[in-house]
């Protein structure tokens, strides 16, 4: 896709939160590889683990299909999210993060991402297929806040 997609123009303030996402190098590599394989479409995954006062720890990645087959958006199936949530609870875990890619733009949340962060109030890891960068964000009090990935 050529040019700049205005859906990804950052139009809101980003501040950094003290809480972190713990994601292994192996898991980072798996997510990046998956995002690259799904190009030119956005990819997405559900990350399962545990939350404490200090961090969210990712223990399992559930790669999911982007049924929208779009270069600028993805669809979260409520049934898939429910299924993953139920399986996580059976293992004393929970959904801790949503992952998705921006194949041809920066690893920053779009206005569309911000809208859906309200519906899925988890941290969101965004991978840039353009810069190969991975950043994490959460929506708190209508402000997008950046979270460290460690």
Stretches found by the model and what they are:
Residues 2-95, 104-150:
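Conserved beta-strand-loop surface patch within small alpha/beta domains used
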Residues 101:
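Short, well-ordered beta-to-alpha junction loops that form the rim of enzyme active sites
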């Amino acid at each position: 896709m050529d040019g700049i997609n205005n859906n990804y123009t950052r139009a809101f303030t980003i501040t950094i939160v003290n809480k972190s996402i713990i994601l292994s190098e192996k898991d980072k590599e798996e997510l990046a590889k998956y995002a690259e394989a799904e190009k030119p479409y956005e990819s997405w995954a559900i990350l399962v683990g545990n939350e404490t006062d200090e961090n969210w720890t990712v223990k399992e990645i559930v790669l999911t299909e982007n049924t929208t087959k779009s270069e600028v958006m993805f669809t979260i199936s409520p049934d898939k999210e429910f299924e993953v949530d139920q399986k996580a609870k059976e293992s004393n875990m929970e959904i801790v993060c949503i992952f998705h890619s921006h194949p041809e733009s920066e690893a920053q949340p779009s206005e569309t991402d911000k809208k859906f962060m309200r519906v899925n109030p988890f941290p969101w890891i965004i991978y840039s297929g353009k810069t190969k960068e991975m950043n994490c964000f959460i929506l708190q009090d209508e402000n997008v806040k950046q979270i460290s990935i460690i």
